[in-house]
Amino acid sequence: MKMHVCFSVILMFLSIFFINGALSKLERLKHPVKKKSDGSLSFLVIGDWGRKGGFNQSLVAHQMGVVGEKLDIDFVISVGDNFYDDGLKGVNDPSFEASFSHIYTHPSLQKQWYSVLGNHDYRGNVEAQLSKVLTQKDWRWFCRRSFVLSSGMVDFFFADTNPFVEKYFTEPEDHTYDWRNVLPRNKYISNLLHDLDLEIKKSRATWKFVVGHHGIKTAGNHGVTQELVDQLLPILEENKVDLYINGHDHCLQHIGSHGKTQFLTSGGGSKAWRGHVQPWDPKELKLYYDGQGFMSLHITHSKAKFIYYDVSGNVLHRSSLSKRSAHL
């Protein structure tokens, strides 16, 4: 009888392990936190940048270096469209050095870069950007379709948003997308949503940030990505995710309301000034800047502060969230 009970208990724990652990296939990483007096984590976010220094990319990179030095940043996040116009042709494409290694040269930017893919990256050889060969060329480079990064009091959930966008499949125009390891699309999306939801629910971090390329709430030129509104936004809301960070629209933007997920766009890494703004509730639209720039985040256990900068390093917008009174 006792053996039967013990065996049943073991089976129960094994079942729980396989249900909650093995079904998530997202790669998990840990970034060690520096020992700072306030125990904080600092990083920069840049998107839509890779133009071999053109369209003010080099100027933005310089200001990133200046701010990165002041904040003593831990790492940099890239929200996609890393190489224009059509990603990389292969691991030996000179665009990697011309748009990345030779541009972000400031000492403060010699930190780990964590990157996701944008739609322009999918127009090239996706496997090249995911390859360890690039890491051998420049140790800072790390790019995956989707993954989880833990650093101190923050868990980051990087999500590949490109396959969600139906028109890339039904109306590709004259573009060719590299959908290797993505098809069948519906299964890929279903698995990703399952894994994201599972990983976010498992997280015990103080702060939970989701990072993707496409916007969920945006007044930018591209407008909202309805597929993400329908499929990803409910997961963010159910799990009380603090921030959704994206690029795609070539602007700097903050949309948010009291007590809910804040939506931060940092897509001003190079070409910008689209001159088109979608109508949006002014109570939610805290910042819309149709130009080049980037953002910084400084995180402690009690506060998440974020600042937007233009191409000259001028501060455009400051805001913060507090854990002591939920969201501000």
Swiss-Prot record:
Source superkingdom: Eukaryota
Main localization (coarse): secreted
Amino acids binding Zn(2+): 81, 119, 213, 248
Class of enzymatic activity (EC top level): hydrolase
GO molecular function, one term: acid phosphatase activity
List of residues binding substrate: 248-250
Free-text remark on how the cofactor is bound: Binds 1 Fe cation per subunit.
Short name of any one Pfam family annotated for the protein: Metallophos
Signal peptide boundaries: 1-24
Reaction catalyzed: a phosphate monoester + H2O = an alcohol + phosphate
Record localization: Secreted
Residues at the catalytic site: 222 (proton donor)
Residues holding Fe cation: 48, 81, 84, 250
UniProtKB keywords: Glycoprotein, Hydrolase, Iron, Metal-binding, Secreted, Signal, Zinc
Carbohydrate attachment residues: 56
Cofactor: Fe cation; Zn(2+)
EC number(s) stated in the UniProt entry for this protein: 3.1.3.2
GO cellular component terms, semicolon-separated: extracellular region
Matches recorded under CDD domains: MPP_ACP5
Tissue: Expressed in roots, stems, leaves, flowers and siliques.
Alphabetized PANTHER family for the sequence: PURPLE ACID PHOSPHATASE 7, TARTRATE-RESISTANT ACID PHOSPHATASE TYPE 5
Subunit comment: Homodimer.
Family to which the UniProt record says this protein belongs: Belongs to the metallophosphoesterase superfamily. Purple acid phosphatase family.
Protein name: Purple acid phosphatase 7
Native source organism of the sequence: Arabidopsis thaliana
Gene behind this protein: PAP7
